[in-house]
């Protein structure tokens, strides 16, 4: 687009408006959008070229890894070669860790996701706006999935395919844990029971580990076990043939992770648990 405003994940021109898709759909609120003059006296709201990456849901791990990050793959080579193209994304936390792994300095990232006032986010005007293909909610598109895997695996020297059969006596099991009500109340008992029954198996939790370590762990994993959420979006980095066991709430379950698993030839298993998605529960 030429000569457009960027407001969070949306692109606005005088006669049209583009929403980012994903789970935001067409509901990205622009009721508080304020079109600033193209030339701002402070010089900090205008720019030449920008790549609009994130929408308002990108701070969620699944939404970031499956609905925002894959959009970067289409423009990756150009963004690396031309650091004058600004990338819009929160410039901190796990998002900045991902962008750093992919080779983007913090100076190339612009955070338009902090409120400028109590009811309005910053607006920025750019002469050229790159806006990649929107993603669907809850179901990553296969071409973008394989493209971002290829890029990430090349950056971290990881493999996409197993080179030897699984040794059932010496497996790596990643326990995808959470710190909220989605985590089963008896999760510690489950882990203790599994460790006692399979003493030679390595059980590792991803909690507290940085993004690079998480990606590497899931890539090495033979089996991933965890509740809905719990950074299960990391199964997109698993090798083909790994097994995923997800604790799925009966009342509010969805097939987000099944969609990813099916595209990557992962062995997906579902264990139904009682109640709804954010209600404290135990795994039977």
What is each model feature region?
Residues 1-284:
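The feature primarily captures lumenal catalytic ectodomains
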